A protein has these predicted regions:
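P-loop NTP-binding site
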Residues: 1-182
């Protein structure tokens, strides 16, 4: 609003029609990371695409570090330990993104037998050195200093970190596209 932008909200199933009805293409499409694959197939490659999670990484964290963490996904081996960290304390649902979807996607993508640990809210392990990767939520429920402290801890322990959005982009083959949002 401060930049005098016009925002249009729609569901994935109506996105094609919305784009067709615009006189000019949008400058940017922001989606939920879980819809990356479907949205990327609808939105022309000339239109910038990102997600709320990626924007949070840029706003509260170190986007370059998290992009590097996405590359670490390809280096995972059988029995590597992965920490899935969520900053909020929501009630987990049957098909929860952190405890169900991400482990399933990572196992399928890598073809490896991976071991997962989970943390939520203010809880973040003191010793993270045994993890080969940290997958962190976008951090919308914690402040910038808290998110950067977690990232600094990962950096000091030499443990790659990726956020949910970049993980979904990597797995769907659109990491480069979504990281070019400026």
């Amino acid at each position: 609003l401060d930049k005098k932008c016009n925002a249009i909200c729609c569901q994935v199933h109506t996105l094609s029609g919305v784009l067709e009805n615009l006189k000019t293409p949008p400058s940017l499409v922001i989606t939920d990371s879980q819809a990356f694959k479907e949205v990327a197939n609808i939105v022309p490659s000339t239109v910038r695409l990102t997600s709320f999670s990626v924007l949070m990484a840029r706003y509260k964290g170190d986007m370059e570090m998290l992009l590097g963490g996405a590359s670490a996904i390809d280096l995972l081996e059988d029995h590597d330990r992965i920490l899935v960290a969520e900053a909020c304390t929501h009630h987990r649902q049957c098909n929860d993104i952190g405890s169900v979807k991400i482990p399933t996607l990572l196992k399928k993508y890598t073809g490896k037998e991976l071991e997962f640990s989970f943390s939520s809210g203010g809880e973040f392990p003191d010793d993270i050195s045994d993890y080969k990767l940290i997958v962190h939520c976008g951090g919308c429920m914690i402040n910038e200093a808290s998110m950067k402290a977690r990232m600094d801890k990962a950096r000091e322990s030499k443990v790659p970190m990726v956020n949910y959005g970049m993980l979904f982009a990597k797995i769907n083959g659109i990491l480069e596209r979504i990281s070019n949002i400026l």
